[in-house]
């Protein structure tokens, strides 16, 4: 197939050559500046129309020395997946510098709506774009809307607040992710009946709430012999998740499945069985003597150093994966497109859901 040349490949020099005028004259016509004879204006505009020429926004901004600043509001605390996103942002430094962009990360307690709203409010008038891992709460929603009203471009990252006036969401379809986790747990449990545990960070995080919703949909309709227990909220903290799950396992010896919706994975694994993490010599406070990791189907999220080890050791059965590098790059590209008034390439920025097991670890 023959390659199609796009009109944007043309430069001002090409238009000037075709119209028989100088570069300065073309620039004056493009920006409606005075001092150009009417017949010259007509000639330049005719050349532009014939070639469907569009000025290159990025080149024009670079020529004017236009710099932009973006802020990423991220969860504080040891969340391995969020740390991966931050690391990928750091790897983009050369790409960012070439476009006169700077990105800073702002760590905050995203489980505390007041703290998160305050972090967003502090950015008003201070940056061109904000990407935020958001809690779906009225105070956070109002803070997002205030940023938008102030002219800041806002993208929700990983966890959405669709009722706000944010400009775009970058992340997976979390209901579909939860349904996928439900299908995996149900099918891997097999013919057994029993109970299923869910550990989440917070149901106030929309990504966690949507995953739970999707998971419960599948459990209720496709696996009626499995009973889903009330959700434990571990705030993505290892110690809290371990304590909550440990108590639940002792109270319900017939648990056959576990869905870990967010982080806190090390605590969840410790509650299941210490010997799965023998290389770290962690203390099992819940069930080391029962070998529970061999009985409970364990599905979680994201491929990190820890989940990779758990998958290889057979403690974790599957991870629902989203590409943190893609999310970091997509969030920056979307913010830049919004700031420039350019179209968002939605298919390019769509974040896929992948199922990762021991046999297809990347």
What are these regions (language model features)?
Residues 129-130, 134-148, 215, 230-306:
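Hydrophobic alpha-helical
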Residues 1-66:
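N-terminal helix-turn-helix DNA-binding module of bacterial transcription factors
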Residues 55-118:
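Amphipathic helical "hinge" segments at domain boundaries
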Residues 75-83, 104-115, 136, 170-179, ...:
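Hinge/beta->alpha junction and helix N-cap segments in small-molecule ligand-binding domains
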Residues 219, 323-362:
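Hinge/cleft segment of the Venus flytrap/periplasmic-binding protein
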Residues 138-176, 304-312:
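Flexible loop/hinge segments that line or gate small-molecule binding clefts
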Residues 177-197:
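A conserved helix-loop-strand patch within extracytoplasmic ligand-binding domains
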């Amino acid at each position: 197939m023959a390659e199609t040349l796009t009109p944007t490949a043309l430069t001002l020099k090409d238009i000037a050559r075709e119209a028989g005028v100088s570069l300065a004259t073309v620039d004056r016509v493009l920006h409606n500046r005075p001092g150009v004879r009417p017949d010259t204006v007509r000639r330049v505009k005719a050349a532009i129309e014939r070639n469907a020429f569009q000025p290159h926004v990025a080149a024009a901004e670079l020529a004017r020395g236009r710099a932009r600043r973006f802020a990423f509001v991220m969860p504080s605390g040891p969340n391995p997946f969020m740390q991966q996103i931050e690391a990928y942002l750091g790897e983009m430094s050369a790409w960012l510098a070439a476009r006169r962009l700077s990105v800073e990360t702002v760590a905050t307690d995203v489980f505390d709506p007041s703290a998160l709203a305050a972090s967003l409010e502090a950015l008003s008038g201070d940056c061109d774009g904000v990407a935020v891992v958001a809690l779906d709460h009225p105070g956070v929603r109002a803070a997002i809307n205030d940023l938008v009203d102030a002219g800041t471009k806002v993208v929700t990252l990983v966890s959405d607040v669709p009722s706000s006036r944010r400009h775009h969401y970058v992340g997976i379809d979390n209901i579909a992710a939860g349904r996928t986790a439900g299908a995996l747990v149900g099918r891997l449990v097999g013919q057994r009946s029993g109970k299923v545990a869910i550990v989440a960070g917070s149901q106030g995080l929309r990504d966690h709430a949507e995953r739970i919703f999707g998971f419960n949909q599948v459990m209720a309709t496709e696996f009626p012999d499995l009973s889903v227990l009330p959700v434990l909220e571990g705030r993505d903290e290892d110690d809290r998740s371990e304590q909550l799950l440990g108590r639940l396992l002792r109270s319900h010896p017939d648990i056959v499945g576990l869905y870990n919706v967010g982080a806190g994975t090390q605590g969840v694994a410790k509650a299941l069985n210490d010997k799965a993490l023998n290389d770290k010599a962690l203390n099992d406070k819940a069930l080391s003597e029962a070998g529970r990791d061999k009985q409970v189907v364990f599905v979680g999220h994201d491929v990190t150093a820890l989940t990779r080890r758990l998958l290889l050791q057979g403690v974790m059965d599957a991870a629902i994966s989203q590409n943190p590098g893609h999310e970091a790059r997509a969030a920056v590209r979307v913010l830049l497109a919004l700031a420039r008034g350019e179209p968002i390439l939605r298919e390019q920025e769509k974040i896929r859901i992948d199922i990762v097991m021991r046999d297809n670890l990347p």
